[in-house]
Structures are given as structure tokens and as C-alpha cells.
UniProtKB/Swiss-Prot annotation:
Known function: Catalyzes the attachment of aspartate to tRNA(Asp) in a two-step reaction: aspartate is first activated by ATP to form Asp-AMP and then transferred to the acceptor end of tRNA(Asp).
Principal EC category: ligase
PTM annotation (Phosphoserine): residues: 241
UniProt protein name: Aspartate--tRNA ligase, mitochondrial
Phosphothreonine: residues carrying this PTM: 218
The EC number(s) this enzyme carries: 6.1.1.12
Organism for this UniProt entry: Mus musculus (Mouse)
Gene Ontology CC annotation, any one: mitochondrial membrane
Keyword Mitochondrion attributed: yes
Binding site for ATP: 265-267, 534, 583-586
Stretch list, region Aspartate: 243-246
Matching CDD domains: AspRS_core, EcAspRS_like_N
């Protein structure tokens, strides 16, 4: 059933003869991806085959064909299924003595061996058709066969329903890529990128420009990979984004820039992050925030797969403050409710000391979420897990309140809740018989963040018990805007750091606060969120050199010498400009429903940042390091140096 599902998506639309005008082979994945005058790609041009395995139909009966592919499986030495990236076709193994050599090749070749066969397209015997297979009405009566390459014993079966560990899949990635799931993911990714390029360059005049991947270290942001140079003590860095280059392109008058950009971040072990990733990078001159948003909405509409429901634009928008107050996060999953409600007024006269203490503070508040049908799905141990989670991760207390079947309040704290408070809480939160209320108190941001986490934990628990909250077929986009421009540093709360990056322009109405209360300034930044995942972030940039220098030097205490090239460029008539970067890996992962971004990247790294197939990163000999004036200090060497009071370094030049 699973294989048939993917085959139908993979091979849909292949029944017409090649050369006629129609949707391309993968156009069945998207209503928007097919140009009205586009012809089917000639998949068999320039190669030693006449057809692909997935395109043959009853309309080809009697035709002589040559096919190349992998042996998917074989049954009773009577027939086998041949597979290529376009689909499957049944091959009838000849049984007569005159074709003994052909039979020997096809019967003795191991599964996943590569063969080329030639023969005639014939109908399957009545009753033996396979309606789940796009080529299920026909089979190939083979006349000649050639073993192109035999396959040795496989480390795992190449079938989507066969479970493999991720480590094994990454070690033998070239085999894992043969699966229909990976074929579908990568081809859909390719087609979405093609349509994005078409939308931006052909329809809206963007210029596709490659920017350098060898750059210099920049202040702030994520850690960067260093690349040694032949100058002693000097290093390049791999850019975490083309941010500075695309701004410089606007100074250079390119007006509209686009790139499928490779980016790099040395973030260590992150379960679902990659040290190298791809983003759709965009920058425009003379644009405001709404212009970028409308462009991106049109871009996604144009490139959206046709087997999904069409996108409705414009996407809804929400301020950062609203997102935090309602969902407890700046990237809310709006597919389900369970919104945060401020119930401070309900408990102004409460006898609960925990709530009294919170409300007595200037920023104190009481917040709650209602888990609809929670009593139906959640168990006692689930409630205990939620309470321990709050204490362990937030040092906060959570009060579970629920109604039993007789509509009597049942809670460890029930005796402290007055009748008026119960009725008002039930009214304000629209509590039903099987609902559970999770209530907490404290400083606004901390209380909201806690309930935002519990909201997702409860959704996980409910879905684990059989409830349906987050429909995977629903794609809920949301713009989040009006972020704070600066945040207090965790290690030094009196100092500021950029909430996103130091090139974001402040809201025009907040510029005066830069010189008096910079922590209150909002930035012209906007994030695009899909189903609780940030898939894009952008901003209107600072194009005034004096303002950029003030923010870097005075507010952020950064060394402006590192950005002297950018500051100098802004002094030479930089236009107003803004842009955005969309995370391609994350976007395709969500569109395909893949469990990890590693399932939509051809050759990803493991969660530890390693290439399990090639064993990268690898050691380098001292002779190879010599031109770079680098000497490696191994851990034992570092310990010895520490003992002798010499500062240890992993790299010395």
C-alpha cells in the first residue's frame, strides 16, 4: 500500500507519448509548477534506452523498447520488477531454451543489480493486472538482457517500509537515495527551487548572483567555521549568510538580488541542525516591509506543490508581543487553539499564597491554558510529568485544575479557590466538562514562555493518546513582526546584543529611543513561521552609515574595524533596502512531511556534524598543515602545557 502510494505520486502523468505538450513528469506534484507550453522532458535522450520504466502504458503495446534499471525483486524465476527513478515495470523472464542465456542473466543477477533489457510491450494476462502500479496493465517480453553491474550483498533492503537506523542510512547514503521516498523528496525540492528561480528572475527581474564563501569573521551571530590561509595567523571564515554581500550589491545598484545560497554555522551538536545549509536569499532596493512580505507570499504560492491545498494569501500577521502573550513563543503553531489567557483579575483576592506573591510584584501575572478534552486523554502520570517539567525547566509551579464527570471542581488546590473564582474562570476560559486548566503565575514573559512549552507538550501527549490537533495536511503560515531590536545579554544583563543581527533598521517611530531607552526600540524585522517552525527571517536594513556606526560602536560595543568596508559603502549613496532569507531545507522538510531535514538533503551530516559515509572531518598530516603555519595540539599536549602554566590552544600559528 505504501509503495503503491509513492509510485502513484512518482509516476502520475506518464501515460502520454513523449513529445506532446502537457505537464512535465513531476508537474503532477504541483498545479503551479507546470508551464502551459512546457513539453515533457526527454528523459531518454542521449542515453542507451528508449523509455523509462515508469512511462510505459497500454498505448505502447507492440512497441520494441530498451530499458535500463535496477532489479527491484524477482519471483519464482518467472518475472522480475525493474526500477529506475521514474517508476517500476514488470519484466517477463523467457522460459524457452532458445533464450537460456537471457534467463540465466536475469535469474542469477542479485537484487539491486543494474541491467539493460530489450523486448516487446505486451498485455498482462487477464486477471493479473495491478491497478496500484502505473504500469500495471503491461509487461515486457524480454528478447535480450545485459548485466551492467552486479550488486553484492546489501547492508539493508532498499524499501521504504523496511526500518533502518539513521546511522546506517547515512553510512550508505548512496543506497538510501534509491528509495522512492528520497527520490520524491529531492525531486520535489529541485522543482520548487526551479519555480522559485523562475518566479524571481523571469517574472520579477531579480538577478541570480553568487557571493563568496571565503570571507572574514563578523561580529555577533552564530559561530563561524574558520579556514586557514597561507598568511601566518590569518584565517578566512565561511559565512553564516551572504548578509553583507547582498547589502553591498544594493549599494552597487543591482536593485534586486537572489541566490540559492550555501551557508555555514559551527553550532556543535544540534539534533536537527546542519553545519552547512541552504537558504533562498533575497534583497531589494527601495522596498518596505510589506513589499518583501507580498513578494515572499507570491513566491511560495507560485512554487507550492500541486498535490497540496493551494495557499491563501496574504498570510496573517501578529506582533512579537501578541505571539508571546497568546502562544508563549515567537514561532507559534496556529493549527490548534489552547491559547494563553490572562486570568489575573479572576484571582485578585485569592487565598493561594503562590498567586498572591506573584500578583504583588510589578510585572506579576496569572496565566492559564485550557486543554480541551484533557481529562479524556491525559493520565495522572501525564499531569505529574507536566508539573515536574515546569519546575525543572522554568522553576515555576503549575496548578492543574479540572472538572470531573459530575462537574464538581477537582484539584489539589480546590479548597483554596472560592466559588466566585471558579465560576469566573469557567466563564472566561469557556471550560467544558472534560477540560483541564493549567495555571501558573509569575513575571509575564516567563509565565507565557512556560505555558507556551506546556501547550506543545500537551499537544504531543494528546496526539499520542489518539486526539487530532495538528493536521499534517494543513499548512498554517504566519508573519511575526515588531520584534525588539535589542536584548539584554544573558551573561551581562546591563549590556545589549542584537535580537537578530546588527544591520536591522529600527522602527521609524522608535528611533528617538535609541539615545534614551534602546531596550524599548522595535526593529523592522519579520519572521515567517509555518506550523510552529521559523522558515524565514528578514528585515529592512540600516542604510545610513552614521546610524549603523552608532548602533555598532555605542550600543553593541562592537569593533567597527571588522565592518569598515560596509560602513564605508553606506557612505557612498546606499539606497534604502531590505530582504529575507528562507530556509530551504526546513521548508521542504515541512512540505514533504519528512521527520528530519536530513531526509530532504542528498548528503547531510549526522546530528554530531559528521559525514558517516566518508568519515569527515578527518585528520590532516603535519606536512599538509605546514604551508598554513598551523601546529595541532592534541589533548595530551594541551594538558601538559596547562601543567606548565602555558595557555593551551588547539591551533597555533
Amino acid at each position: 500500500m505504501y509503495l503503491g502510494f509513492w509510485l502513484s505520486r512518482l509516476c502520475r502523468g506518464l501515460s502520454r507519448p513523449i513529445g506532446k505538450t502537457m505537464r512535465p513528469i513531476w508537474g503532477s506534484l504541483s498545479r503551479n509548477l507546470a508551464l502551459s507550453s512546457q513539453r515533457i522532458p526527454e528523459f531518454s535522450s542521449f542515453v542507451a534506452r528508449t523509455n523509462t520504466c515508469g512511462e510505459l502504458r497500454s498505448s505502447h503495446l507492440g512497441q520494441e523498447v530498451t530499458l535500463c534499471g535496477w532489479i527491484q525483486y524477482r519471483r519464482q524465476n518467472t518475472f522480475l520488477v525493474l526500477r529506475d527513478c521514474h517508476g517500476l515495470v514488470q519484466i517477463l523472464i523467457p522460459q524457452d531454451e532458445s533464450a537460456a542465456s537471457v534467463r540465466r542473466i536475469l535469474c542469477e543477477a542479485p537484487v539491486e543489480s543494474v541491467v539493460r533489457v530489450s523486448g516487446t510491450v505486451i498485455s498482462r494476462p487477464p486477471g493479473q493486472e495491478n491497478p496500484k502500479m502505473p504500469t500495471g496493465e503491461i509487461e515486457i517480453k524480454v528478447k535480450t538482457a545485459e548485466l551492467l553491474n552486479a550488486c553484492k550483498k546489501l547492508p539493508f533492503e532498499i524499501k521504504d517500509f523496511v526500518k533502518k537506523t539513521e546511522a546506517l542510512r547515512l553510512q550508505y547514503r548512496y543506497l538510501d537515495l534509491r528509495s522512492f521516498q528520497m527520490q520524491y523528496n529531492l525531486r520535489l525540492r529541485s522543482q520548487m527551487v526551479m519555480k522559485m528561480r523562475e518566479y524571481l528572475c523571469n517574472l520579477h527581474g531579480f538577478v541570480d548572483i553568487e557571493t563568496p564563501t571565503l570571507f572574514k569573521r563578523t561580529p555577533g551571530g552564530a559561530k563561524e567555521f574558520l579556514v586557514p590561509s597561507r598568511e601566518p595567523g590569518k584565517f578566512y571564515s565561511l559565512p553564516q549568510s551572504p548578509q553583507q554581500f547582498k547589502q553591498l550589491l544594493m549599494v552597487g545598484g543591482l536593485d534586486r538580488y537572489f541566490q540559492v545560497a550555501r551557508c555555514y554555522r559551527d553550532e556543535g551538536s544540534r539534533p536537527d541542525r546542519q553545519p552547512e545549509f541552504t537558504q533562498i536569499d533575497i534583497e531589494m532596493s527601495f522596498v518596505e516591509q510589506t513589499g518583501i512580505q507580498r513578494l515572499v507570499e507570491g513566491l511560495l504560492q507560485y512554487s507550492w506543490p500541486g498535490d497540496k491545498d493551494p495557499l491563501v494569501t496574504p498570510f496573517p500577521s501578529m506582533t512579537f508581543a501578541e505571539a508571546l502573550a497568546t502562544y508563549g513563543t515567537d514561532k507559534p503553531d496556529t493549527r490548534f487553539g489552547m491559547k494563553i489567557v490572562d486570568v489575573s483579575d479572576v484571582f485578585r483576592n485569592t487565598e493561594l499564597r503562590f498567586l498572591q506573591d506573584a500578583l504583588a510584584k510589578p510585572q506579576g501575572t496569572v496565566k492559564a491554558i485550557c486543554v480541551h478534552d484533557g481529562a479524556k486523554y491525559l493520565r495522572k502520570e501525564d499531569i505529574e510529568f507536566i508539573r515536574k517539567f515546569a519546575v525543572h525547566h522554568f522553576s515555576q509551579e503549575v496548578l492543574p485544575i479540572f472538572l470531573n464527570a459530575k462537574k464538581n471542581w477537582s484539584s489539589p488546590f480546590a479548597k483554596f479557590i472560592m466559588e466566585e473564582e471558579r465560576l469566573e474562570l469557567a466563564r472566561s476560559m469557556e471550560i467544558q466538562e472534560e477540560d483541564i486548566v493549567l495555571l501558573t503565575a509569575g513575571e509575564h514573559e516567563k509565565a507565557c514562555s512556560l505555558l507556551g512549552k506546556l501547550r506543545l507538550e500537551c499537544a504531543d501527549l494528546l496526539e499520542m493518546r489518539g486526539a487530532v490537533l495538528r493536521d499534517p495536511a494543513v499548512f498554517s503560515f504566519l508573519w511575526v513582526v515588531d520584534f525588539p531590536l535589542f536584548l539584554a545579554k544573558e551573561e551581562s544583563p546591563t549590556e545589549l546584543e542584537s535580537a537578530h543581527h546588527p544591520f536591522t533598521a529600527p522602527n521609524s517611530s522608535d528611533i528617538h529611543l535609541l539615545y534614551t531607552e534602546p531596550e524599548k526600540v522595535r526593529g523592522q524585522h519579520y519572521d515567517l513561521v509555518l506550523n510552529g517552525n521559523e522558515i524565514g527571517g528578514g528585515s529592512v536594513r540600516i542604510h545610513d552609515a552614521q546610524l549603523q556606526r552608532y548602533i555598532l560602536e555605542t550600543l553593541l560595543k562592537e569593533d567597527v574595524k571588522l565592518l569598515s568596508h560596509l560602513l564605508q559603502a553606506l557612505d557612498y549613496g546606499a539606497p534604502p533596502h531590505g530582504g529575507i532569507a528562507l530556509g530551504l531545507d526546513r521548508l521542504v522538510c515541512l512540505v514533504t512531511g519528512a521527520p528530519s531535514i536530513r531526509d530532504v538533503i542528498a548528503f547531510p551530516k549526522s546530528y554530531r556534524g559528521q559525514d558517516l559515509m566518508s568519515n569527515a572531518p578527518d585528520s590532516v598530516s603535519p606536512e599538509e598543515l605546514k604551508p598554513y603555519h598551523i601546529h595541532v595540539l592534541w589533548p595530551a599536549d594541551s594538558e601538559e602545557e596547562s601543567a606548565s602554566a602555558t595557555p593551551s590552544k588547539h591551533l597555533s600559528s
